[in-house]
């Protein structure tokens, strides 16, 4: 199981939000590229970047910071936030990003996901954010009437590389991930699932490792590695042992 460090960008700096609320942010580093390099040096094999301003605005907002991150690291990086059309996807992939994440647009325009997968095979990830099992969009500002499982099933046959599943009520709260909801989603589809939201201790990662066989292939961690609640290199060592058995 991959442990994937997150870099959330707001106004060009590295922040963390509580429950996706833009007015509840903490700045952790004003140099996102140096932060990305730090996670790479601790053993990260993949970086997760979110353009928070883009997620709320619906268009890219932190391109300079994203470009600086990609230039600084040699590991793959994936990006989400404000990606609503093929032109934006193409523009980001041309910067050197390995994968892009379609979130709000996946719910509002499933055809975009299908077209993107056809044009950029293996490089499209769907981000599904849910509150009490229901999909939330527009930077989590709006909860829809569709379940996370029903949305995931729409993309079963179009070549999505992975689904990132975030339980919003857990995100940034350091309360532990929603194991059962993550397992249910992973078992409902054949697409690999990456868990996100609420990971606060190594024990949380151990708990997620118990559902790896259900199709959970990675875990994104943000706030916990910035506050020191989890040391990234220790989490990577923990999951690495599991990978070698």
Swiss-Prot record:
GO terms for cellular component: cytoplasm. The active site is at 8 (proton acceptor), 129 (proton donor). CDD domains: HisA. It comes from the Bacteria. Pathway: Amino-acid biosynthesis; L-histidine biosynthesis; L-histidine from 5-phospho-alpha-D-ribose 1-diphosphate: step 4/9. Keywords: Amino-acid biosynthesis, Cytoplasm, Histidine biosynthesis, Isomerase. Pfam families: His_biosynth. This is 1-(5-phosphoribosyl)-5-[(5-phosphoribosylamino)methylideneamino] imidazole-4-carboxamide isomerase. It comes from Pelobacter propionicus (strain DSM 2379 / NBRC 103807 / OttBd1). The lineage of its organism: Bacteria, Pseudomonadati, Thermodesulfobacteriota, Desulfuromonadia, Desulfuromonadales.
């Amino acid at each position: 199981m991959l442990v994937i460090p997150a870099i959330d960008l707001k106004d060009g700096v590295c922040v963390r939000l509580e429950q996706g609320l833009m007015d509840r942010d903490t700045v952790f580093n004003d140099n996102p590229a140096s932060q990305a390099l730090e996670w790479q040096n601790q053993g990260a094999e993949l970086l997760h970047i979110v353009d928070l301003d883009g997620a709320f605005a619906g268009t890219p907002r932190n391109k300079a910071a994203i470009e600086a991150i990609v230039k600084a690291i040699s590991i793959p990086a994936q990006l989400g936030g404000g990606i609503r059309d093929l032109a934006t996807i193409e523009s980001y992939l041309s910067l050197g990003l390995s994968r892009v994440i379609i979130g709000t647009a996946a719910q509002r325009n499933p055809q975009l996901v299908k077209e993107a997968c056809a044009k950029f095979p293996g490089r499209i990830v769907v981000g599904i954010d849910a509150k009490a099992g229901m999909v939330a969009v527009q930077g989590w500002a709006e909860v829809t009437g569709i379940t996370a499982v029903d949305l995931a099933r729409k993309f079963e046959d179009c070549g999505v590389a992975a689904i990132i599943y975030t339980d919003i009520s857990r995100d940034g709260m350091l309360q532990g991930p929603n194991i059962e909801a993550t397992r249910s989603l992973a078992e409902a589809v054949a697409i690999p699932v990456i868990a996100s939201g609420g990971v606060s201790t190594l024990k949380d990662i151990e708990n997620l490792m118990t559902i790896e066989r259900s199709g959970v292939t990675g875990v994104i961690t943000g706030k916990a590695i910035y506050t020191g609640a989890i040391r990234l290199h220790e989490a990577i060592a923990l999951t690495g042992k599991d990978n070698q058995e």
